[in-house]
Amino acid sequence: MCPMPSAESTPASVREPDSVRPTREDAVAAAGSELIGGPLGRRALLGTSWWTPVRVIALVAIGMFALGLVQKAPCYNGAWFFGASSQYTHACYSDIPHLYQGRGFVDDLVPYFDKLPGDMEYLEYPVLTGVFMEVASWLTTGSGSIQHQEQWYWMVNAGMLMVCAVVIAVCVTRTHARRPWDGLLVALAPAFALTATINWDLLAVALTSAAVLMWSRMRPVAFGVLLGLATAAKLYPFLILGPLLVLCWRAGRWREFGKALGGAAVAWLVVNLPVMLFAFDGWSKFYTFSQERGVDFGSFWLILVHNTDNPPSTETVNTLATLLMLLCCGAIAALTLIAPRRPRFAQLAFLIIAAFILTNKVYSPQYVLWLVPLAVLARPKWRDFLIWQACEVAYFLGIWMYLAYTTSGDAHKGLPTDGYHWAIGVHLLGTLFLCVMVVRDILMPDRDPVRQTGDDDPSGGVLDGARDVFVLGPAARTGQHSAHFEGPPLVRWGAGSADGRFALGERVGAGERVGADGRAGR
């Protein structure tokens, strides 16, 4: 087999044609490109401009984030502070300015250590998010009226969250090396721009995206550390370790999983242990609040409660939601082990977080941020992504119109309860639709947009192209579960020859795999 040239010795103009161009692979992307001059031509000279995919996508992400800030302008200019329902009718609500005073930052109270007046008692956020909030309060001017300080606090947080948004877009762009332009889906996602400054979720999403990038680069310890930090900012990221465990089981990569798990545990403890030891009541508030919180906005449980004469108690919902989540975890594990070809890491990460969102007793509109980067990596198909985003934007508008209805008194300006139930249903169906498409790709790998272009698992790191060692079901009996690649599976270098090896730029067809001899086979 001809030696593969290194990245250092290969000009960009030679490497670039191996990149996947969305305007050639995706009909919706091609149609959308007409707004900026049409699809890229076959003879386009690539790799010679300052405008690399990473730079373009980072700037687009900043631009879309700025549009999201403009959308919040009516609230910034007064709706957060005057009128019971105006912040909802303008669909520009944010927790950030309200919690500046409501959680004691205006009074310089120390999160977790100083008790708050009222029923909440302590800050109800994980430690790293509390640190983020506290740092923003240090950067906020302490002079002027409370309204002026809250405006400053929101702006400071918006600047910090914009950095997180760029990190997310760049990490997604760099995770699938041959598909950098998939990052545009993150940068252009309307639900991302609309919900980015509602709360502090982008911190955890940025750390999770960076963790996935590190795993794709075969750095399990760095992955674990970043995932541990993400879990210290929000609870959901630790769920990704579940499907990763099953994938490493199927591929026999226990050592790498152990490193990742150890790094995550150490990072989480470094952040949490000091607060646990010296302010346990404040530290535990997030967990007790999550457990004691009743059925809330956005979940199918709320529809059930609103339409039942004898609604279930919070304890019952907690138990049932946990059981449903465990069933989903079992189903995802079984799917991983019986799939004809080992699922990609991003596919399972998306499914496990989507399962948590669908079964949880609350769905705040900013939770869509958890799924956006994972959805792009799991199924980078513009049509399906935009269908899901349309559903999420509909829910975003629905919840604010419902709150406008409930807070406008006898005027009842907004969306009544039945209409809000339909909005919840749209959100649930949109998320389920994307889940079904991902599951179909797992069961029918030739339908997977990533694998159609010759990749195996570009976000999988050590799993990319690895042989299977434990498989269940028909795949184990037929021996069709192995998808081994000799060397890096993403690029086919070398001149064509009589023995059938690949020529430069030649691509393996859908459903084929590369054997140890470099030949294509079924």
Language model segments and positions:
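Periplasmic/ER-lumenal interhelical loops and adjacent helix-loop junctions
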Residues: 277-323
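Multi-pass membrane glycosyltransferase architecture that uses lipid-linked
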Residues: 2-284, 322-522
